[in-house]
Design a protein with these regions (language model features):
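Extended recognition/assembly regions associated with phosphoester-bond processing machinery
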Residues: 1-54, 58-197
Length: 197
């Protein structure tokens, strides 16, 4: 958000890979370092005055305790910015020194929440991890995406191991009253995608 010098991200799901160990499943434990390094790099590049986290920063309430020393330092470096922390469904009991958490947050006319509420006007949310699948030069491609209409924006998940809910899901009909636009994350730019269902 250029006018407010704000960086808005959701669904980092830090330490998702290590959360599966208790279930006997092992994933390469590099999701947290990748996500934090990308976030720190973008904060250095854009120099926002504030970061607005739209929930599920951590995959569970004990994830912070599983961070390695380097990851904790990266996290602390990111938190040197002014932080608005909206709680998600995965980290709703997370507490960290000197960080106030919100169930939703209003800035100017916008409401920032983790899960979209149909009653909210001018809302920016996360939670659904939207993704779009399309063909490009005969190859099927799936990409995280923004979903945007006149009143709402749903952000793509920022975390490395987040997966996604395809835009063809009926769940999005419960969020958007109007038809929405799709903007997929490319390697170097955001691409508008035409809906063809």
């Amino acid at each position: 958000w250029i006018e407010e010098k704000s960086l808005i991200v959701g669904d980092l799901h830090l330490e998702k890979s290590t959360s599966y160990i208790d279930q006997g499943n092992f994933l390469p434990p590099y999701d947290t370092i990748d996500t934090l390094e990308r976030l720190l790099n973008i904060t250095k590049e854009l120099s926002p005055n504030r970061i607005i986290f739209l929930g599920d920063v951590f995959h569970d309430n004990s994830a912070f305790d599983r961070l390695k020393k380097k990851e904790k330092q990266l996290f602390k470096d990111i938190l040197k910015k002014n932080v608005i922390w909206v709680k998600g469904n995965h980290d709703n009991n997370f507490k960290y020194v000197n960080i106030k958490t919100y169930t939703s947050y209003k800035l100017k006319k916008f409401i920032f929440s983790h899960i979209s509420d149909k009653k909210n006007k001018l809302e920016i949310s996360a939670h659904y991890h939207p993704k779009v699948t399309f063909k490009f030069k005969g190859t099927k491609i799936s990409k995280p995406c923004f979903l945007i209409d006149k009143e709402k924006i749903i952000l793509p998940a920022y975390g490395a191991y987040t997966g996604g809910l395809n835009i063809s899901s009926d769940i999005y009909k419960n969020v958007f009253l109007n038809d929405y636009q799709i903007y997929a994350l490319g390697n170097t730019k955001v691409l508008k995608i035409e809906k063809k269902f």
